[in-house]
Amino acid sequence: WQDIITIKTWPRPPAGLFFLRDFAIFLPDGTLAAAATSSWLFINRATRLPDRNAMKQVSLPYCHQSILGHDPKRLSENTGYEAMARVYPRFSDFDFHAHVNNSVYVGWIFDSYTSGFHEQHRPLRIQLDFIHELISDGEISIGMYRHGLIHHFEGRVSEKATLCFRALVEWH
């Protein structure tokens, strides 16, 4: 728990409406331990829609290096999801903008497994696609579709069946 790691991050030029940011995490010996790319967009607080004007006003020192070698692509829809968990967002799940933060979805997914599963498996790859903002504290249904050790997830507001996120976790 006392290891010192190095995290490097840099912005890449936007791809359409999305801004990209790459991350590289290195162990003390310089070995790459993890790599990630996030995509995000500016949202107008009043309309809750992408803000193209704000995008034009951003001036960042972009780096064209892609740590993954490709841009993130959306996960495709699957059928045959089985009910995995039901969760209720708590106050601490909401961010400054009063919606559930993407990192909370990963926690919900991981918490839906037994401790025995976690003792036998480690995540190899995680992908999370934000679909619709979650701003209520109602019940969220999490469904899972398994293909070997590749597990696909979707989270929906139970009351309206509104799709909030899709995710993929590959285990080893």
Predicted regions and their residues:
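A conserved acidic, glycine/proline-rich C-terminal tail/linker
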Residues: 116, 120-147, 152
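Aromatic side chains
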Residues: 23, 91-94, 105, 130, ...
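HotDog/MaoC-like acyl-thioester-processing domains
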Residues: 1-74, 134-136, 145-172
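Hot-dog-fold acyl-thioester-processing enzymes
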Residues: 33-37, 44-124, 172
